[in-house]
């Protein structure tokens, strides 16, 4: 998948021709141009099923009032894009504690100052009592676990 920059008026035009929620810009353009996909389906399996960049934008992130709120918002967008793969984040751990779990209790057992919070609209919990640098590192690890290339993982991290 390639990324291109387009003018706002073209973006608005493409977005106005969306037929269903979650339809990608590529699908809309193929339909508008009456072009079939030239890529075989097997190749698309190496890329994430849906890109978080289709849902996540700077303005939405900046509305969140704190670093923790932004952190949880970004994680929730990653979960929404990759719900079936998200359980892979359970493998992300620190030296002495677990970072992600399916329950608050599981995180509390790995430390009494973890301040666990539920990732919105997901069954997963994450520790939030870390500094911003550690939260950025965690976001990078999550993105890489979900199949994003390093450059895209860094872009996701930089939303924080």
From Swiss-Prot:
GO terms for cellular component: cytoplasm. Keywords: Cytoplasm, DNA replication inhibitor, DNA-binding. GO terms for molecular function: DNA binding. GO terms for biological process: negative regulation of DNA-templated DNA replication initiation; regulation of DNA-templated transcription. It comes from the Bacteria. The keyword Ligase does not apply. Negative regulator of replication initiation, which contributes to regulation of DNA replication and ensures that replication initiation occurs exactly once per chromosome per cell cycle. Binds to pairs of hemimethylated GATC sequences in the oriC region, thus preventing assembly of replication proteins and re-initiation at newly replicated origins. Repression is relieved when the region becomes fully methylated. Homodimer. Polymerizes to form helical filaments. This is Negative modulator of initiation of replication. It comes from Idiomarina loihiensis (strain ATCC BAA-735 / DSM 15497 / L2-TR).
